[in-house]
């Protein structure tokens, strides 16, 4: 007999269903064989936890809830035999109960005065005399009826048990029982139908497929035991051999005398065999009691899943001393105290005899004691993985020896070029930017890339020295290799931002093939957990963990990493009990012979969590081929004879629209000002009108790119249902007064909330405390409104990472996805929209000749757009070939030198001329003031950036000329510079200037949070020197080049900053950064800098200075302008 859980729709047999209900606390069960819900005969209560089947000796069986049972029977009248979920028998006896309930005469159907024999035959008193075997039947009045009818064992005192009031209950069977069949459902309303479908779709879209059948109730394991130095060496040797490629070596090492006992679970010392489950494990490991919390798990189980293959971790490379999130007073990630020198790959002496009582402290305080996981493996990495040359952060190190991979194609990116500027941490509450401290000594950093106090040196726009060379992989042999590679890159990034969790205990699985294990974490007075949640959420009792939450699980030296997620959790005796499972792409098996102190947990940011979840949802074969980069992408060219909505589209734009309609994957190159927004608008209109397919999802890495498209659609197509979804941090910037305010989801939801819930919403916006009941009611009503609005939208605009939020889980399928600024989207973040359900067409729109995203981990900078073009799987990418933004004098050099003449002007000099401006392209020679170095310190990283006060003074003069002489509004002027320090210095000077800011209005900041790595508020990362901030002074925009990508202004002033005797220009050498800087202006571009330094700093700059000299637009004073 099969049963189905009404809450999660999972179907099991009786035994498995009872385990499921006990662990999840789901309440309602459906009997699929009899087509009915299990409920109380009296009140129809369906809560399985309150129900029990009661047997009155051999007389009758009834199904009652606890409340009805207490009402009907007193203590002395209550029978001793009952079957409930608590004693694990209610579903086992359900079939017998149904048999008794349905019992009637086989001849006439009478339900009363019955008699039964051991063959299961039933006759009433009237029909019994007609049978020739009447003597074999027993009457229901004898008290032995059920023993004979059901074949139960009859005990000696069975007749002494309490008798049921009124005898056996009738009227429950086929002739109309009172509460057996489920009540007739009321007709489902439209609102209820939407809610039901939304819930089912959300649950499906939130599921992580599981390969383990373990849950908290049935888990059988043993406590991870710390090893002594002698045994640790043996385990280390065993683990090393286990990690070698080839047949599984899991059972090797069991021949050790210390471990020679059969089925010794932990494999360390003389531990006895532990035949336990989670309820009777070692007492001090906090066993799981029965009263579990309702976890409502959405992790489906494939009980036939196979164990993981034994293979070497491709990332087992000798690592330098890594940053630790515990601050300056913490131990580093290799387990050495700060101040100790750690030579990569070098063995140091040490043992456990340190005098520390805590084994974890003994390990962390040992001077480089070898991790019990074993020696560093010299195995080569798996095929298809990215290769790293890791720069040393210590005085002495060695490079890892890695053999080239013959089956993959690689390109090498120089980390001294093509690098975006890093981002400073932004305090959202502050209206002004804090100026970094001046550098006290010029040569302070010349100490092997460190300051005197041992902090890492980082120059803005340059990579950390440990990742100075990176070889990216253009193709992968299989999806698991691909996912493993990017998971490790995410781990490297996250450990620069987040702090490790060290205090926990592990229960390893006894089954070698199981991929799940248990982690116990103290709930109370745990400072590590207090850092994971804001104070207001802690006050509401929100747990620090949640189901499906991913983590990085690694050894103390970070040489081995496992990627895990929480399958199920509960809170037991003041501890979080986490049943975690390996993601399916893990290469390493569980290290079940090692103690808890040898590992640490790294929490992930919300962005990284969504990426890892997206990795579990990539199932579309076409997209898998796209990611692996081995098969050519099919391209179909067909003239659809479309009727375009606009007659202003050029030929390249029309071709692009037709290509999208004919192909599942489209790569569209869109140089600056070529009408990408107009092309995307036409694609959306054609998809809706021709295919009636919606919702169409439009995503990008930045909000500005999304807003440009949304504003155009909103203005030109008011009849289309448009929705703009923002991250929580951005919602306050998009009020009703914003141009897009009326289509923003949070504003629409607020207007549709009840008055009481609007009050609660206002409290949460102000950061005020609310009660738990208010929080619950608000969450339910907000979800209901959100589901309805999202389900009815035709076009949804959001960022890549926000596309993985809970709002879009309600969408059953998303037929068309358009990604704008695809080169600014890291490949990791691209996986989020790529993994959405039901995608038929995916459109990448970008320009590989402009800046990509920035990350401290080089692999996370490359976009999927770039990699697809580099590996040659997309043979003929389309390109929009006509620019309409820039004055031809401004666009001439980028067209020739950067776009190789493939781009052309769609405007004339006359169309882009500004009254009174004779030189639309103007270079102002500014060589009198040298650059200054500025330092910003965060945690263990010292970042350097640059400013030039003399250039700032001259730029103020230029702005005044544009304002007063050329009549250019401040809103049409933008000042851009490569360096954040120059941006901040300029902003400070302009804010105090009485001509430019006569009313002394405070500076405003417009920021677009970096949705993936180095987000605003992250501390201690090199990339946090500069985020996507635009300072606005009385309408005038001041920004870095990187943050101004995607923007345009009538006039742009470009401050180059660099002026030194060494002719060094840093990341100004980046061809893409120069391209962005030169292509932001529509009517006039003014470049301020020292032509001599720029000319000698880079070949491309030399060409540009030569071009400017040929055009005779280099001036030493401003009178010519």
Swiss-Prot record:
<feature type="modified residue" description="Phosphoserine">
    <location>
        <position position="227"/>
    </location>
</feature>
<feature type="region of interest" description="Disordered">
    <location>
        <begin position="233"/>
        <end position="452"/>
    </location>
</feature>
<feature type="compositionally biased region" description="Basic and acidic residues">
    <location>
        <begin position="307"/>
        <end position="316"/>
    </location>
</feature>
<dbReference type="Pfam" id="PF13086">
    <property type="entry name" value="AAA_11"/>
</dbReference>
<dbReference type="Pfam" id="PF13087">
    <property type="entry name" value="AAA_12"/>
</dbReference>
<protein>
    <recommendedName>
        <fullName>Putative ATP-dependent RNA helicase ECM32</fullName>
        <ecNumber>3.6.4.13</ecNumber>
    </recommendedName>
</protein>
<comment type="subunit">
    <text>Interacts with the peptidyl release factors SUP35 and weakly with SUP45.</text>
</comment>
<keyword id="KW-0597">Phosphoprotein</keyword>
<dbReference type="GO" id="GO:0000184">
    <property type="term" value="P:nuclear-transcribed mRNA catabolic process, nonsense-mediated decay"/>
</dbReference>
<keyword id="KW-0378">Hydrolase</keyword>
<feature type="compositionally biased region" description="Polar residues">
    <location>
        <begin position="376"/>
        <end position="413"/>
    </location>
</feature>
<dbReference type="GO" id="GO:0003724">
    <property type="term" value="F:RNA helicase activity"/>
</dbReference>
<feature type="binding site">
    <location>
        <begin position="670"/>
        <end position="677"/>
    </location>
    <ligand>
        <name>ATP</name>
    </ligand>
</feature>
<dbReference type="InterPro" id="IPR045055">
    <property type="entry name" value="DNA2/NAM7-like"/>
</dbReference>
<feature type="modified residue" description="Phosphothreonine">
    <location>
        <position position="465"/>
    </location>
</feature>
<keyword id="KW-0547">Nucleotide-binding</keyword>
<dbReference type="InterPro" id="IPR047187">
    <property type="entry name" value="SF1_C_Upf1"/>
</dbReference>
<dbReference type="GO" id="GO:0003678">
    <property type="term" value="F:DNA helicase activity"/>
</dbReference>
<dbReference type="InterPro" id="IPR041679">
    <property type="entry name" value="DNA2/NAM7-like_C"/>
</dbReference>
<feature type="compositionally biased region" description="Polar residues">
    <location>
        <begin position="278"/>
        <end position="287"/>
    </location>
</feature>
<dbReference type="GO" id="GO:0003729">
    <property type="term" value="F:mRNA binding"/>
</dbReference>
<dbReference type="GO" id="GO:0010494">
    <property type="term" value="C:cytoplasmic stress granule"/>
</dbReference>
<feature type="compositionally biased region" description="Basic residues">
    <location>
        <begin position="251"/>
        <end position="263"/>
    </location>
</feature>
<dbReference type="GO" id="GO:0016887">
    <property type="term" value="F:ATP hydrolysis activity"/>
</dbReference>
<dbReference type="InterPro" id="IPR041677">
    <property type="entry name" value="DNA2/NAM7_AAA_11"/>
</dbReference>
<dbReference type="GO" id="GO:0003723">
    <property type="term" value="F:RNA binding"/>
</dbReference>
<feature type="modified residue" description="Phosphoserine">
    <location>
        <position position="392"/>
    </location>
</feature>
<feature type="region of interest" description="Disordered">
    <location>
        <begin position="157"/>
        <end position="187"/>
    </location>
</feature>
<dbReference type="GO" id="GO:0005737">
    <property type="term" value="C:cytoplasm"/>
</dbReference>
<comment type="similarity">
    <text>Belongs to the DNA2/NAM7 helicase family.</text>
</comment>
<dbReference type="GO" id="GO:0003677">
    <property type="term" value="F:DNA binding"/>
</dbReference>
<keyword id="KW-0963">Cytoplasm</keyword>
<feature type="compositionally biased region" description="Low complexity">
    <location>
        <begin position="323"/>
        <end position="336"/>
    </location>
</feature>
<dbReference type="GO" id="GO:0006449">
    <property type="term" value="P:regulation of translational termination"/>
</dbReference>
<comment type="function">
    <text>Probable RNA helicase, which may be involved in modulation of the translation termination process. Probably unwinds double-stranded RNA. In vitro, unwinds covalently closed, circular DNA in the presence of a DNA topoisomerase TOP1 and replication factor-A protein RFA1.</text>
</comment>
<keyword id="KW-0347">Helicase</keyword>
<feature type="compositionally biased region" description="Basic and acidic residues">
    <location>
        <begin position="426"/>
        <end position="452"/>
    </location>
</feature>
<feature type="compositionally biased region" description="Basic and acidic residues">
    <location>
        <begin position="342"/>
        <end position="363"/>
    </location>
</feature>
<keyword id="KW-0694">RNA-binding</keyword>
<keyword id="KW-0067">ATP-binding</keyword>
<dbReference type="InterPro" id="IPR027417">
    <property type="entry name" value="P-loop_NTPase"/>
</dbReference>
<feature type="compositionally biased region" description="Basic residues">
    <location>
        <begin position="160"/>
        <end position="184"/>
    </location>
</feature>
